[in-house]
Amino acid sequence: MNQQYPSVLLEKAVGEFSKLPGIGRKTAMRLVLHLLRQDTATVEAFGNSIITLKREVKYCKVCHNISDTETCQICANPQRDASTVCVVENIRDVMAVEATQQYRGLYHVLGGVISPMDGVGPSDLQIESLVQRVSEGGIKEVILALSTTMEGDTTNFYIYRKLEKMGVKLSVIARGISVGDELEYADEITLGRSIVNRTLFTGTV
């Protein structure tokens, strides 16, 4: 046991919390001590919610968004514009775009971006399923709404090359978002305008 901790159990709990992104050991300690001050029922409810989430959450068979059912609420909504698909990096980006209330189409969640430095290639992402969706017909426009980073631009270009001869309009969100920014950190007004003012993708990185 590390002499810094009075309990092995405390040390293990802090260690697990500190594995979460953005959580250092000091913050992990505060969270663990907070839980220790709660009653048993509250802590059990917290733990069970995470276990249940991991065991039972589904990914939409159409767009790969998180869902409680086989098809997510967005894809199942007949009032959404099924002819337009917005391609995003992750589920947080879906939530960010939805918060703008400026988009009524569907989504396609890639699960990341192409990043050779991190060992992420096209086959690790949901790119082929996007190609399959487009090939099935009905989609008129694909909006590329990835982060304005080198990896995001590389992924945009790769998708463009896969779809350029499939008869769909390929557009990209306007560069109201600063280069290097991730979509989820853009404010709602800026992101909303970037979607509304999207431009034709020309295939340049």
UniProtKB/Swiss-Prot annotation:
Domain of life (superkingdom): Bacteria
Record's keyword annotation contains tRNA processing: no
A GO MF label: DNA binding
Family matches, as InterPro entries: DNA_Rcmb_RecR, Rcmb_RecR, Rcmb_RecR_Znf, TOPRIM_dom, TOPRIM_RecR
GO terms for biological process, alphabetical: double-strand break repair; recombinational repair
Domain Toprim: residue ranges: 83-178
Chain intervals annotated as zinc finger (C4-type): 60-75
UniProt cross-references to Pfam families, sorted A to Z: RecR_C (PF21175), RecR_HhH (PF21176), RecR_ZnF (PF02132), Toprim_4 (PF13662)
Function: May play a role in DNA repair. It seems to be involved in an RecBC-independent recombinational process of DNA repair. It may act with RecF and RecO.
Similarity annotation: Belongs to the RecR family.
Annotated protein name in UniProt: Recombination protein RecR
Gene name linked to the record: recR
